Amino acid sequence: MVLYFTGTGNSRYLARRIAEGLEMPLYDLNACIKAGNTAPVQTGRDVVLVTPTYAWRIPRVVSEWLGKTALTGAERIWFVMDCGSEIGNAAGYNRQLAVQKQLKYMGTAQIIMPENYIAMFNAPQKEQAKGIVEQAEPELQKVLTQLRAGQEFPPPRDNLYDRFMSGPVNPVFYRFFVKADAFRATGACIGCGKCVELCSLNNIHLENGKPVWGKNCTHCMACICYCPKEAIEYGKKSRGKPRYHFEALERKQQDV
């Protein structure tokens, strides 16, 4: 089974491609986490977990969900992580997670996809994003070949910098940067509730037709990037930046 968590669609796209290529079922962790569902999941022998990279590891909400949820029938697990640039030493923590789940760790693969973290970085324009997705195709095909053969992924880069970013920096990053207090709706907001619907942590609700954010945020960027009116800002950091979600690329390809 292919399990995935996504912020703005990159991981969903990769998970869908992997599930189709392996003829395996696809399991949406966003819906599961939003519903608070930790019932056992009948996965079968092989599990592929596809996630974005948050602070140089898999998202904390995903590792917490896995800690509470039995993967019935699972014996082996592969991790596929998409990122804007690097995953640090995420593989070391993925190995620990596999051991905790009593699963054979089959490795971690990194796939570069378009950046979406506009709370800190710039997202690409659509044409540039499309090019990044095209450049990811050879790595995705390599991942599919290894998965079909039941092979372990080769070890990713692991140096002192990687261990530092995934180690000491990760909890510090969550503590000081992963907060919702800078999100706000502008006058362009139409109160459609899209952000409420998309928030996997149920951290957004509408008051007087405008979104209000709570304190349980994972910085997935779904609310700000999927807003149909681009009416959400993250303080001053997101001003003037393009919004990115994968489905906009698919629509652009269909329009051509």
What function would you assign to each model-found segment?
Residues 184-185, 190-212, 216-218, 222-239:
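Iron-sulfur cluster-binding cysteine motifs and their immediate structural context
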Residues 50, 82, 128, 186-187, ...:
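Conserved short-loop catalytic and cofactor-binding motifs
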Residues 35-37, 116, 235, 244-245:
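Short secondary-structure boundary/hinge segments and terminal tails
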Residues 230-256:
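Long, positively charged, glycine-interspersed low-complexity recognition regions
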Residues 159-191, 197:
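A mid-sequence, solvent-exposed acidic-amphipathic segment
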Residues 1-2, 6-14, 20-32, 39-51, ...:
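FMN-binding flavodoxin-like domain, especially the glycine-rich phosphate-binding loop
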Residues 56, 113, 208, 234, ...:
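Generic structural "secondary-structure junction" signal
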